[in-house]
């Protein structure tokens, strides 16, 4: 368990060394699209073949550094039409439309050897693209919120912390005043991810000034539009980043309870969020007296029932309360009387923080 900032930094450095000792990494996309295409079968098949070949294999980041090949189930790479996807590091090779029968060749050429399987690379206009970053689909993208998706084990808190995770929470707790946090979010220009585009900093400011003792932070992960998978990709691919953003919102506003409202039709997102919350609680990063700061924060998941209208704020809070998900007349707004009639920060943009 991590009790304070010193232990958080020690944990980070320890597992960072373990990551650096892994001389090759196999990242198999475990987003919903690739899983539907059989990516988990590919993961198990290639891992089995590698073990049978007598090569050192790990599926979990160990405390002590070991030279080994790491097998990881990553979040969504975003290139779903070409799935199942598999990435080999440190080379950055991305294999597309991989099948279980391709695993023998991947083992021989890319794991035992140091060359790509050219037929599995992405091809366009007669050219093969070895590095993922050079593929036209990715080349002009600058990933900010999705920076970890496709590059890390979505379920490993050790890897998240090793890459700097929960350092922002430590900074908010010990190096910043609550007003400074709110002002920084306002200065960033961050807005909601829905159609209204309401400034996130103003929501934090309005909830922070409320005199109520009990306040809430609610993440709206309910996207009802057919074919809209923005929220799902974030929750599946980098759940700890969502948790950390909600915690910072809690620090800024004086809220100690959070809810993630997620569609029940996203079972993988629900599973990964549950795993992430349990891991954070086990390490002492959720619960009472986080990092010996005196700040408490708990987080719960509420699964929606598929109602499109529950994407609207007041309908969403009604659904969490166990009532029929119906919008109410405003004012009062959720920042004044939201969940259980208490001031509530309701947003998905908190993950950007």
Regions found by a protein language model. Name each.
Residues 1-351:
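Feature of Fe-S/electron-transfer and energy-metabolism proteins
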């Amino acid at each position: 368990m991590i009790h304070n900032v010193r232990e958080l930094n020690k944990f980070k450095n320890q597992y960072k060394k373990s990551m650096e000792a892994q001389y090759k990494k196999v990242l198999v996309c475990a987003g919903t699209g690739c899983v539907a295409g059989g990516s988990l079968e590919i993961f198990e098949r290639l891992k089995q073949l590698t073990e049978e070949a007598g090569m050192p294999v790990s599926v979990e980041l160990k405390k002590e550094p070991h030279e080994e090949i790491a097998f990881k189930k990553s979040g969504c790479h975003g290139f779903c039409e070409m799935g199942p996807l598999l990435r080999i590091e440190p080379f950055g090779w991305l294999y597309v439309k991989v099948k279980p029968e391709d695993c023998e060749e991947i083992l021989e050429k890319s794991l035992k050897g140091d060359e790509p399987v050219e037929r599995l690379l992405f091809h366009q206009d007669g050219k093969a693209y070895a590095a993922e970053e050079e593929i036209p689909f990715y080349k002009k993208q600058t990933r900010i919120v999705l920076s970890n998706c496709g590059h890390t084990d979505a379920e490993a808190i050790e890897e998240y912390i090793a890459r700097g995770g929960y350092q922002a929470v430590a900074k908010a707790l010990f190096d910043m005043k609550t007003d400074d946090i709110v002002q920084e979010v306002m200065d960033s220009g961050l807005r909601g991810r829905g159609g209204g585009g309401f400034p996130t900093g103003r929501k934090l400011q309005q909830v922070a000034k409320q005199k109520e003792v009990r306040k809430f932070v609610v993440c709206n992960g309910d996207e009802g539009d057919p074919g809209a998978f923005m929220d799902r990709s974030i929750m599946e691919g980098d759940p700890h980043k969502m948790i950390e953003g909600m915690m910072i919102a809690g620090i800024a506003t004086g809220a100690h309870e959070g809810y993630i409202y997620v569609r029940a039709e996203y079972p993988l997102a629900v599973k990964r969020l549950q795993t992430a919350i349990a891991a954070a609680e086990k390490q002492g990063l959720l619960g009472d007296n986080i990092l010996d700061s005196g700040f408490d924060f708990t987080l719960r998941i509420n699964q929606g029932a598929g109602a499109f209208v529950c994407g609207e704020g007041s309908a969403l809070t009604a659904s969490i309360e166990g009532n029929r998900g119906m919008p109410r007349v405003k004012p009062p707004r959720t920042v004044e009387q939201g969940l259980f009639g208490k001031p509530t920060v309701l947003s998905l943009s908190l993950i950007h923080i």
